[in-house]
């Protein structure tokens, strides 16, 4: 099972990923967030990291505006190896060579929005 988590910046992409996983018959558990309302990404990085470490899920996908903050937070947990990937090559390489267990994705719904 795949653990999914995001902040408000990643919510829309997470919804698309859920549709894709449903179509492919891949099981997942959504750990939030559940809307576009502003939230703090560390909450969801922690939930997904714990789901993997506790054995509820095998792998995870985390999404925030840059993918960086949420992956840094997840990597604070011993046994978690989160990697920001921007294409299929880096995703496959980090899985094969670094044994990454969380894929961290970028999603900026408003590219001109200041951080």
How would you describe each model-predicted region?
Residues 1-17:
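N-terminal beta1-alpha1 ligand-phosphate binding loop
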Residues 5, 62-67, 85-86, 104-106:
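Short beta-strand segments
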Residues 27-38:
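A short beta-strand-loop structural module common to alpha/beta enzyme folds
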Residues 44-62, 66:
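Short, structured active-site "lid" loops
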Residues 63-81:
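Compact, glycine-rich, soluble single-domain proteins
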Residues 77-104:
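Short, acidic/small-residue loops that bind anionic groups at enzyme active sites
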Residues 106-115:
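Single conserved hydrophobic/aromatic residue that forms the stacking wall/gate
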């Amino acid at each position: 099972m795949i653990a999914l988590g995001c902040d408000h910046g990643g919510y829309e992409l997470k919804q698309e990923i859920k549709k894709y996983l449903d179509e492919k018959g891949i099981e997942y558990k959504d750990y939030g967030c559940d809307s576009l309302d502003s939230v703090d990404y560390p909450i969801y990085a922690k939930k997904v990291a714990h789901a993997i470490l506790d054995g509820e899920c095998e792998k995870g996908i985390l999404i925030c505006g840059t993918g960086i903050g949420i992956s840094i937070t997840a990597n604070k947990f011993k046994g978690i190896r989160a990697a920001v990937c921007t294409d299929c090559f880096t995703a496959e390489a980090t899985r094969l060579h670094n044994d990454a267990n969380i894929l961290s994705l970028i999603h900026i719904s408003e590219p001109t929005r200041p951080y």
